């Protein structure tokens, strides 16, 4: 007689664990495919600094993203990322490289499969690598958050706040790879001038959840990402530090132009 209740309890426990697992990952509601674009990188005041090229494609059942920014003085920034979209959105690789006239200046990378992250800054002669705690399907870096938000859009528009993990690098006390909890939320509908056009976008906020002690030593600004409105939700604008928390805050626009305007609340 005792076996049946125990069996039922075991079944319920397994069911709850399965539900918890599925709830912690991001269901792909907006599958990404082949795309090619030419974004612009600006300072926070909208002055254009670099021409960009965005490439995205599917290969070996993986989504690949390469974004390159070329500056007039010979600087080149390049971001690369790889994702799995089934059974849930999962980032597998990410890297960011800054070079000048072909020579590497700064490099940051994270292998989500092995759990290793690394950083290199040439001028400071710093090279670090560290094992990081990756939660598959919940840990992202760089453009990965734009893809994650496009699939979380309906939930966030409905008022839900979703916590994810972000791979970052702290300059204090040393150049250390870290995984930080971030809260994603909806900030409102904005309009912004871009490449001579007035466009609308939904603003989403990525807020780092730092401990009180950490806040005493480092200030990590929120990152803002705008997705196109109305749906389907595609990338429109990104604002945040280049890489480290104390880096200059920059803006990346979907459409490249000589001048980029600030985002302002849409008057309904």
How would you label these PLM feature ranges?
Residues 122-164:
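Surface-exposed beta-loop interaction hotspot
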Residues 9, 28, 142-145:
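Short N-terminal alpha-helical targeting/association segments
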Residues 24-114, 163-268:
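Acidic, serine/threonine-rich low-complexity disordered tracts
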Residues 115-119:
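Mixed-charge (acidic/basic) macromolecular-recognition segments
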Residues 1-9:
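Bacterial N-terminal signal peptides that target proteins for export
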Residues 8, 108, 124, 132, ...:
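Small/flexible residues
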Residues 9-20:
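Bacterial N-terminal signal peptides
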């Amino acid at each position: 007689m005792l076996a049946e209740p125990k069996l039922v309890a075991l079944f319920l426990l397994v069911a709850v664990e399965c539900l918890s697992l599925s709830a912690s990952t991001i269901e792909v509601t907006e599958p990404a495919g082949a795309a090619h674009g030419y974004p612009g990188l600006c300072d926070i005041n909208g002055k254009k600094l670099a021409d960009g090229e965005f490439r995205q494609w599917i290969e070996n059942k993986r989504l690949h993203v390469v974004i390159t920014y070329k500056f007039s003085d010979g600087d080149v920034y390049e971001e690369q990322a790889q994702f799995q979209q089934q059974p849930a959105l999962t980032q597998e690789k990410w890297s960011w490289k800054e070079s000048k006239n072909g020579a590497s200046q700064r490099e940051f990378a994270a292998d989500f499969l092995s759990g290793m992250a690394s950083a290199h800054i040439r001028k400071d002669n710093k090279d670090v690598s560290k094992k990081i705690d990756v939660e598959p399907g919940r840990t992202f870096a760089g453009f990965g958050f734009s893809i994650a938000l496009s699939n979380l859009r309906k939930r966030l528009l409905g008022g839900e706040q979703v916590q994810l993990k972000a791979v970052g690098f702290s300059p204090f006390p040393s150049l250390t790879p870290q995984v930080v909890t971030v809260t994603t939320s909806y900030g409102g509908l904005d309009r912004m001038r871009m490449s001579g056009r007035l466009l609308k976008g939904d603003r989403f906020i990525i807020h780092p959840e730092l401990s009180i002690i950490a806040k005493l030593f480092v200030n990590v600004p929120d990152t803002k990402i705008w997705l196109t409105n109305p749906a389907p939700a595609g990338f429109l604008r990104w604002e945040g530090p280049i890489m480290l928390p104390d880096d200059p805050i920059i803006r990346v626009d979907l459409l490249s132009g000589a001048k980029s305007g600030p985002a302002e609340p849409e008057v309904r």
